[in-house]
């Protein structure tokens, strides 16, 4: 079923339809839906520590507007009708369909007016300039106009939704398709992925040539649980909440591809304790974390120290141990609250292991601040590279490469169809 989502298209849809349960239907009354497009957490189950459990199957669509200049009223109405078709067809839930559509700086450059300065959107090139250290190589800036993130526990839903958006089916879940994107948007990229064990193991086995280092119990490709109550904020925390802001109820979204070709080296060159040092911190050990981090419980620190306290020892650990932890570095930006709401997921698109990284934050500056903490042992140093440890001891940085970056504004639901910069 995961493979069908990765392949996409009519044949995959037909194959999945015969093996899938009928999903719950949606609503034609938009007042029954949250105005925040990214309000997912109240509509999906919680895991054993009370965090929202992300749906198993993911689909990302990168879209380019087919016309020059500012979108016209007819196209705006068509986009809204197409999105409402999805809402009529599927319940707003993990068993139905959850989705967002966001718009890039390149899209807003079509207009003569600017976004309000406190909206928080920035060009992805500015992110690359500030956080991607030289060894990351050349990172591609996304130049699409719009980005959609669709998710469901039912792979049939994703395939039917995509088919409806591009005019390949006449109805979804018994609802007629009254409008589509086919004359509005060009699909410039399509990315897929999955969450939750055993999908990382199974997907690697199916898609990636060679030995499979990922265990069946691993929640992600690098093996360790990474979402805790001290690393995931609420949706409120990342939302634009000022009632006089034109995009109140919106948020900013960062989207990047991390090529995880170092995963095999991660497992082959480091034992479990060494991987724990690099994923969490030198203060952690396997007795407390377990093989996949699940023994840590609600928070990512140890029984003796919070992760915020451990984070204060980052420079000291680099000097004394020659190694620092990924979570340890990031926690320096999480005091008092974590600024990034992560919705990333593993992927094996095109036979390569990836992380499709997605975060929501109040402003892109928040993402930059967090990513600097990940990039440098001592980001406040005038010469931060002088304090670095070898890349293979620098959290997980030596095991992936950033390929592409994009930033988007996710407007509230009532402004989601081709918003103007200052509606």
What are these regions (language model features)?
Residues 1-2:
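Terminal low-complexity, intrinsically disordered regions
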Residues 5-423:
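Long, histidine/aromatic-enriched segments associated with O2/redox biology
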